[in-house]
């Protein structure tokens, strides 16, 4: 069973590295960074506590919101989804991402106090 799992993972990595555009790989690295940051914050919350609760909540909401916005950007700029987003150029999708991220972080900073 482990051999089949390893073969699936190696085939996935080969296809990902060969067929995924550089823009999407960069965005995937950003998504991994946000995911690890959120997991680190949650682990810190479990181990140490949530004394400044607003700060923890703001940071975690920022991670979750940023992850969701980045996934939406990835879906919109993926060349395989070109038919679904005919009226939206990659530049427009990125501008929408920047605008939504700015609003998200303004709300998060307001929540911190």
Swiss-Prot record:
Lumenal compartment residues: 52
Record's GO cellular component terms: oligosaccharyltransferase complex; oligosaccharyltransferase complex A; oligosaccharyltransferase complex B
Subcellular localization, as worded in the UniProt entry: Endoplasmic reticulum membrane
GO term, biological process aspect, one: regulation of protein stability
GO MF annotation list: enzyme activator activity
Transmembrane segments: 31-51, 53-73, 93-113
Cytoplasmic domain ranges by topology: 2-30, 74-92
Keyword Metal-binding part of the UniProt annotation: no
Residues with N-acetylserine modification: 2
The protein's annotated pathway: Protein modification; protein glycosylation
One matching Pfam family: DAD
Membrane-topology annotation of the record: Multi-pass membrane protein
Keywords: Acetylation, Apoptosis, Endoplasmic reticulum, Membrane, Transmembrane, Transmembrane helix
The protein's role, per its UniProt record: Subunit of the oligosaccharyl transferase (OST) complex that catalyzes the initial transfer of a defined glycan (Glc(3)Man(9)GlcNAc(2) in eukaryotes) from the lipid carrier dolichol-pyrophosphate to an asparagine residue within an Asn-X-Ser/Thr consensus motif in nascent polypeptide chains, the first step in protein N-glycosylation. N-glycosylation occurs cotranslationally and the complex associates with the Sec61 complex at the channel-forming translocon complex that mediates protein translocation across the endoplasmic reticulum (ER). All subunits are required for a maximal enzyme activity.
Subunit structure: Component of the oligosaccharyltransferase (OST) complex. OST exists in two different complex forms which contain common core subunits RPN1, RPN2, OST48, OST4, DAD1 and TMEM258, either STT3A or STT3B as catalytic subunits, and form-specific accessory subunits. STT3A complex assembly occurs through the formation of 3 subcomplexes. Subcomplex 1 contains RPN1 and TMEM258, subcomplex 2 contains the STT3A-specific subunits STT3A, DC2/OSTC, and KCP2 as well as the core subunit OST4, and subcomplex 3 contains RPN2, DAD1, and OST48.
Family, per entry: Belongs to the DAD/OST2 family.
Protein name: Dolichyl-diphosphooligosaccharide--protein glycosyltransferase subunit DAD1
Lineage of origin: Eukaryota, Metazoa, Chordata, Craniata, Vertebrata
Encoding gene per record: DAD1
């Amino acid at each position: 069973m482990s051999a089949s799992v390893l073969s699936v993972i190696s085939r996935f990595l080969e296809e990902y590295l060969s067929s995924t555009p550089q823009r999407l790989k960069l965005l995937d690295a950003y998504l991994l960074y946000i995911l690890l940051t959120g997991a680190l914050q949650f682990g810190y919350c479990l181990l140490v506590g949530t004394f400044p609760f607003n700060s923890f909540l703001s940071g975690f909401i920022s991670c979750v919101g940023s992850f969701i916005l980045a996934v939406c950007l990835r879906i919109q700029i993926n060349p395989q989804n070109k038919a679904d987003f005919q009226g939206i150029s990659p530049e427009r999708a990125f501008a929408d991402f920047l605008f939504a991220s700015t609003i998200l972080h303004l709300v998060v900073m307001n929540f911190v106090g």
